[in-house]
Amino acid sequence: YYIAPTIWAWNKGRAKNIVRDVTMVASIFPFEAKAYKEAGAPVTFVGHPLADTVKPSMSFDEAMDHFHGDRDKKRILLMPGSRKNEVTGLLPIMLEAAENLAQKENCQFFIPRASTIPESFLRSIIGNSSLCIEITEGHQYDLMQICTACVASSGTATLETALMELPTVLVYKLAPVTWFLANLLVHVKYAGLPNLLMGREVTPELLQDRANAENITDILLPWIEDEEKRKKNIEEIKEVRKAQGSGGAVHRVARLIVDTAGAVHGRKEK
């Protein structure tokens, strides 16, 4: 089983079926491997494939030219999500925080458009904003490379920004009923993958009512104004890549499949 069910977060009862039915779980997270091992499943930690794929394809200067980056401005990445309901709920908050930042620092903002979100939809929310905002297409890791800081919705994006060593604040909101049910069913301390990996908050999290423009500004502004504070966070998120292993996840999975299949075949022959 590769990319296994998240028994570490919820529905741990599923582990019994997995233990019964699978020959091997190829785990992408250390804490996931621990959860499956405790459940009695045969498990091997192989690492996350993103550890291999998250890297820029351009030099810094090439990326600056490609995205029309302004060297005289702080470049801030806004990542409101890949679903319309996420973008509708989070982008206005991010834009309000961006307005706050722009009043204190000379900033350039970038929104990488997810393939599921039409550009017209983003522009309808941005409206007639006076902010310097670029909506970008593709080369997301090159864009991360040139940015000073980021505000992102929860999900894989925060793992990607951590692997790119980009200081990020995670924001997310659910409908009140959904949030109530999530608190009943989900049993993890953090929402962000970097924090789950490290067992501590290296990527600040703002959830539900705390996900507001004032709080986002309070976290981002020190990173933008004080390079030493930004570097301190970078040193923390550098540990995320170390926690994910040395890369080569896909090759390890392939080797594991061959070895496991060989072992099973050998037992059958006996």
Which residue stretches match the model-derived regions?
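Nucleotide-activated sugar donor-binding and catalytic core shared by glycosyltransferases
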Residues: 1-270
